[in-house]
Amino acid sequence: TGLWISSGSGGNAARGILKKFGLYGLIRLAIPMLPEGMKAWLDVLCFLALGNILYCGWVAMRQKDLNFLIGHSSVAHMGMAFLGIASLSLVGVTGAVTVMIAHGLLAALSFGLSGYLYHQKGSTEINQLGGLLKRMPFIGVCLVIAMLAGCGVPGFANFAGEILVLFGAWDTLPWFVIAGAWGALLIGAIYCLRAIRNILHGPLSDENQNLCDANGITTKLPFVVLVVLLILFGVFPRLLTDKISSSASHLIPASNVGTAQLEPHSNEPLLGQLSPRAVRVRF
């Protein structure tokens, strides 16, 4: 399904929504109804999540079309959310839902930028989009922000979710966390930074001299709103995590053995601020 979603322009809605249906079903149905079954299949689920992160990231790294690159990388992000759900911990599930929300914002921003480039150029082939930062500074800056958020750079909502996923999964299977973290970091950095270099930098070809940057409030406003939300939820993750953790606490089995547990500190809300004062994870 992920490979099909990554290929066609008609799957933009599916990229942002459809992949989350299965993960939402795991949280709402599989964990509450079959908690012991989830525990029995814990190793297999974590292995599948790790394979998704590494394989889809590797495939994204080999893409020569911006739409394909974004599509495959979005499937890899869902692997990180899957890892948080498979950890069967409140921290991990909260991080997984945060990743899903951040991915929805990032997918809208990324494919919106890709669609604008296609409207201007008629193609999203990366080798035909060199030097665009000179002609399209606004779109270029938004694309850099989208790529950095996709890499999991601190300050964006994706980082807040991914770090909670890694904390939640660490006590269960630390080697999976190490492999997943390094794999997502290295592979994601390679394809995102390579896309920034090939699309925005380098010489501007004669064919791209007539390209126009985004003009007018109606064109810029959607991109600005998505960028602001990604940064807002990255700097203040408690806007999401407090509500998510309070709801997820009713779904996670109370008898999770060997998974990360939350230790509330004083009267502060559970999770949220990524600091020892707000959350303590027992390793």
Regions found by a protein language model. Name each.
Residues 29, 33, 54-58, 81-85, ...:
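Alpha-helical transmembrane segments of multipass membrane proteins
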Residues 3, 16, 21, 38-88:
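Internal transmembrane alpha-helices of multipass membrane proteins
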Residues 4-11, 28-37, 59-62:
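Short juxtamembrane and helix-loop transition motifs at transmembrane-helix boundaries
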Residues 6, 136-138, 192-283:
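Cytoplasmic/organellar membrane-interface segments at the starts of transmembrane helices
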Residues 20, 65, 75, 103, ...:
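Divalent metal-coordination and catalytic microenvironments
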Residues 27-41, 81-99, 169-177:
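Helix-coil boundary and interhelical linker segments in multi-pass alpha-helical membrane proteins
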Residues 23-27, 54-57, 111-114, 163, ...:
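Alpha-helical transmembrane segments of polytopic integral membrane proteins
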Residues 1-16, 71-81, 106-188, 208-229:
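Interfacial and helix-entry/exit segments of alpha-helical transmembrane bundles
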